């Protein structure tokens, strides 16, 4: 295969599997870790193992793979690891669905084993898909000491392996030691479907229609009532106060009084009275509803703030399954939506419901299952992130953000946090929280670091008796950690922590903008706590992917396109082309089949160029060796190529502007190299006996030089086709080559100006051939280029072989001086549809006259706007509507078509005929 000419047709189905297999066999992209090259470390996102890559993955991994391949070519020893973020609720839900069970139906250990088996199967599928995409991942360098050999082959780390669990638990213990982790009873976001606490960063907000219910609250110990508007009447059993704005004159007399909670007779018993105080608070919005609000435990974050600020009691009206508790009386046991409807009906029956208004509101939902969240008071584990807010913002300023404006998302999120990070979850498939509790006094007994990993539900605590009270009985922690506790230590783990000092910041974090407030935020917190530094030097952000219909891809909309199907039809290079060309980093992009097809056509174009060039560039000399024989076209393409190297390098070095880089490469390869230069060089390559051996050698040298560099520039973006072609042309791997360097020696604006004139001349000849109905390769008599500038004339004289080759003119001349131009009619056609109705019986004679005297008629129309004739004694006037005249510019006295392509440059084309 090496050294062979590319076969006739480009077929990615033949090329890509071969190189995927070979790269794996050679362990081509393994990180060496030596002293001879600087390291470049990527903190690759560990995807959740769903079993299928989606187009968002394709976008993200293509971005990071382009960086990895580019940096290797720039001389870096690139560490491009791949981990897997295994734990989490979606796997538990899928296991329940597959096996027809719930987590309560199986022993804890067996349920976890089912989750691990499914995860292992999914990782294997996704690993193959990443390989299929052409990602130059290091599958051979382990970041953890695998205990499970079955997991070892799947990536650099797998978070469900015992050693990763050890590292995650180590981090928890360090947070506890440093005073950042704590446990307390506190309101938390709770998902009734998942039956677990979730962090604020895991709450999404969606717009939904609901009703604003206006409810009468009687005034206690007096006459009258006030109307309060609420969207959550089901929380009436948990109403502990009502609030007004202190400057709202409508309710100034109410402050200090009490109101009676409607329907309280139908609710259950509670420790706090059903007469609730009216308080004043500046955070009440006088414009919402009636300007008076009920404070319930808890409707939203604002309720939590008011309860804390005014030391109000807490009533638990909703349980962990999202059902009403006993305090709701006859409504107990109902799910929230059912209770809402029933209580509204009861309010209507009792005469408390004044009216209802349909409104839209933002509702917080679980980001996994989209169930509306509740705020419940639970004892949970937290990490103190609020006190690190300024440190996080300072760290964010030290990191380079691509694009820069994405930093504000992190800063805005940091400033918006009211609560600490809740890290405990009431699930099974996750890292166990490594603590026990004294059965007598509740003292927290953390594991020792040297006994990690531990599962408190199976393992014994590190002490025989409680250090506080002496009790010898302990209860295990059954909660597990938030999965972000696992993934937020990835830059630490890939640099050896906690067994070695972590080498932070790593060079690059590539990720989506949708997880800035989670993965990126939490990772920054952990790096600050565990390593006292920011985690990354650069952050490369990718956007979301939308379907061809303009909507976010989703199975419910039916607009999902599977990456594997695209690869099977068009190849991975075409899919990667879509990823890099569709938009700038950080921007949302649209999947477009036409872009995939363009990528395929571009690969095919490069293939065909190399196929044509193969026989001519073997053993070609260097451009320096043939410098004296270089034509203006040679120098033009060399200048354009070296300018391209500068441009593409700048795009990649200044913000990873992949879309600008691939656009520049494509325009050069397709338009300047393939469409123009090759046409200018073909005759020199194929007919050295006519144009000289030196001219042929120059063309061979230039073609080799440019193709060598072009394949290198394209290699990070389209690694398969470039590898195949580079091996066929140069018998080496393109991915082992250095990144091209631009040489100022070859960049010359004057040369480029001459080259553009050559292109314009060729374009005009092609147009003329098209108009004449000739094929592009047809030979014709000749062309003369008239120029006024002697220096330009000298350059064009040297370009005669280029022009002959590109135009197929038998003779090419260059003349200095300003030619005299004239417009001559080349087609004069009388219009019977206009002349007939106007002149009737004279029509035949008029047409005959025009056909016999075309120049006379055309000249008259040109000069006077009309031709005056006398036919059979009658006056006839023909204007532009009566006669179609097609003019052609010519050099006076010449026979060929002339075109003024720019001031001072006229091309005369002779002898074009069908």
Curated annotation (Swiss-Prot):
GO biological process, one term: valyl-tRNA aminoacylation
GO molecular function annotation: aminoacyl-tRNA deacylase activity; ATP binding; valine-tRNA ligase activity
Chief location bin: cytoplasm
Keyword Ribosomal protein carried by entry: no
Enzyme Commission no: 6.1.1.9
UniProt KW keywords: Aminoacyl-tRNA synthetase, ATP-binding, Cytoplasm, Ligase, Nucleotide-binding, Protein biosynthesis
Record field: catalytic activity: tRNA(Val) + L-valine + ATP = L-valyl-tRNA(Val) + AMP + diphosphate
Keyword RNA-binding: no
Subcellular localization, as worded in the UniProt entry: Cytoplasm
Renumbered ranges of motif 'HIGH' region: 47-57
Enzyme class (EC, first level): ligase
Residues where ATP binds: 555
Gene3D superfamilies from the UniProt entry: 3.30.720.200, HUPs, Isoleucyl-tRNA Synthetase, Domain 1
Family according to the record: Belongs to the class-I aminoacyl-tRNA synthetase family. ValS type 2 subfamily.
Domain notes from UniProt: ValRS has two distinct active sites: one for aminoacylation and one for editing. The misactivated threonine is translocated from the active site to the editing site.
Entries under PANTHER family matching the protein: VALINE--TRNA LIGASE, CHLOROPLASTIC_MITOCHONDRIAL 2 (PTHR11946:SF93), VALYL-TRNA SYNTHETASES (PTHR11946)
The name this protein goes by in its record: Valine--tRNA ligase
Underlying gene: valS
């Amino acid at each position: 295969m090496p050294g062979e000419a590319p076969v006739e047709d480009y077929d990615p189905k033949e090329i890509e599997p071969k190189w995927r297999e070979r790269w794996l066999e050679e362990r081509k992209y393994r990180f060496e870790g030596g002293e001879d090259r600087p390291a470049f470390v990527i903190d690759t996102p560990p995807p959740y193992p769903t079993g299928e890559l989606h187009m968002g993955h394709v976008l993200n991994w293509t971005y990071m793979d382009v960086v990895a391949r580019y940096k290797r070519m720039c001389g870096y020893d690139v560490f491009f690891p791949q981990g897997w973020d295994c734990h989490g609720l979606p796997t538990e839900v899928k296991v329940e669905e597959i096996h027809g069970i719930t987590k309560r139906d199986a022993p804890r250990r067996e349920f976890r084993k089912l989750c691990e088996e499914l995860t292992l199967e999914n990782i294997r599928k996704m690993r193959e898909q990443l390989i299929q995409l052409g990602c130059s991942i290091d599958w051979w360098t382990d970041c953890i000491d695998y205990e499970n050999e079955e997991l070892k082959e799947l990536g650099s780390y797998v978070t469900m392996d015992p050693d990763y669990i050890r590292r995650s638990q180590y981090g928890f213990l360090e947070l506890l030691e440093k005073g950042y982790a704590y446990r307390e009873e506190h309101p938390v976001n709770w998902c009734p479907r998942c039956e677990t606490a979730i962090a604020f960063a895991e709450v999404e907000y969606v717009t939904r229609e609901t009703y604003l219910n206006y409810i009468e609250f009687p005034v206690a110990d007096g006459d009258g009532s006030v109307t309060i508007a609420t969207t959550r009447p089901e929380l009436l059993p948990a109403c502990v106060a009502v609030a007004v704005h202190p400057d709202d004159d409508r309710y100034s007399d109410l402050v200090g009084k009490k109101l009676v909670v409607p329907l309280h007779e139908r609710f259950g018993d509670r420790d706090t009275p059903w007469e609730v105080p009216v308080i004043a608070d500046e955070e009440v919005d006088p414009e919402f509803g009636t300007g008076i609000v009920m404070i319930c435990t808890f409707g939203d974050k604002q309720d939590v703030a008011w309860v804390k600020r005014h030391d109000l009691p807490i009533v638990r009206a909703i349980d962990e399954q999202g059902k009403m508790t006993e305090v709701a009386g006859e409504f107990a046991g109902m799910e929230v939506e059912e209770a809402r409807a029933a209580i509204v009906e009861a309010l209507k029956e009792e005469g408390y419901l004044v009216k209802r208004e349909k409104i839209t509101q933002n509702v917080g939902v679980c980001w996994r299952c989209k169930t509306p969240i509740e705020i419940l008071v639970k004892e949970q584990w937290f990490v103190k992130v609020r006190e690190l807010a300024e440190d996080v913002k300072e760290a964010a300023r030290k990191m380079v953000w691509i694009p820069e404006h994405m930093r504000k998302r992190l800063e805005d999120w940091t400033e918006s946090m009211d609560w600490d990070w809740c890290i405990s979850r009431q699930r099974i498939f996750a890292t166990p929280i490594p603590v026990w509790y004294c059965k007598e006094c509740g003292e927290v007994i953390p594991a020792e670091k040297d006994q990690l990993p531990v599962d408190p539900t199976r393992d014994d605590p590190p002490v025989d008796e409680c250090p506080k009270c002496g009790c010898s009985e302990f209860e295990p922690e059954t909660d597990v950690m938030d999965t972000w506790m696992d993934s937020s230590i990835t830059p630490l783990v890939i640099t050896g922590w906690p067994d070695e000092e972590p080498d932070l910041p790593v060079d690059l974090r590539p990720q989506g903008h949708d997880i800035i407030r989670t993965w990126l935020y939490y990772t920054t917190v952990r790096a600050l706590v565990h390593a006292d530094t920011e985690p990354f030097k650069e952050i490369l952000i990718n956007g979301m992917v939308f379907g061809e219909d303009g909507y976010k891809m989703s199975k419910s909309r039916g607009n999902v396109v599977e990456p594997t199907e695209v690869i099977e039809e068009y190849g991975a290079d075409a899919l990667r082309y879509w990823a890099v060309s569709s938009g700038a980093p950080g921007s949302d992009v649209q999947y477009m089949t036409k872009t995939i097809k363009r990528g395929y056509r571009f690969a095919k174009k490069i293939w065909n160029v190399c196929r044509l060039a193969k026989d001519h560039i073997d053993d070609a000399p260097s451009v320096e060796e043939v410098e004296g024989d270089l034509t203006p076209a040679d120098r033009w393409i060399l200048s354009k190529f070296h300018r391209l190297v500068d441009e593409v390098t700048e795009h990649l070095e200044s913000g990873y502007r992949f879309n600008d880089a691939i656009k520049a490469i494509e325009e050069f390869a397709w338009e300047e190299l393939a469409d123009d230069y090759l046409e200018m060089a073909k005759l020199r390559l194929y007919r050295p006996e006519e144009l000289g051996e030196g001219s042929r050698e120059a063309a061979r040298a230039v073609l080799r030089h440019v193709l060598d560099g072009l394949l290198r520039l394209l290699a990070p973006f389209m690694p398969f086709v470039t590898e195949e072609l580079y091996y066929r042309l140069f018998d080496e791997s393109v991915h082992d080559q250095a990144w091209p360097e631009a040489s100022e020696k070859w960049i010359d604006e004057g040369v480029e100006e001459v080259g553009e004139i050559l292109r314009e001349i060729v374009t005009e000849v092609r147009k003329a051939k098209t108009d004449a109905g000739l094929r592009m390769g047809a030979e014709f008599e000749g062309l003369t280029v008239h120029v006024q500038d002697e220096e330009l004339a000298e350059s064009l004289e040297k370009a005669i072989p280029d022009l002959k080759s590109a135009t197929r003119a038998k003779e090419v001349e260059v003349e200095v001086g300003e030619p005299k131009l004239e417009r001559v009619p080349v087609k004069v056609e009388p219009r019977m549809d206009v002349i007939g109705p106007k002149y009737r019986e004279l029509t035949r004679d008029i047409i005959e006259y025009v056909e016999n005297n075309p120049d006379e008629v055309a000249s008259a129309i040109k000069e006077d706007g009309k031709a005056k004739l006398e036919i059979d004694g009658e006056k006839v006037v023909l204007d532009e509507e009566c006669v179609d005249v097609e003019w052609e510019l010519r050099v006076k006295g010449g026979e060929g078509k002339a075109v003024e392509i720019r001031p001072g440059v006229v091309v005369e084309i002779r002898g074009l005929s069908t």
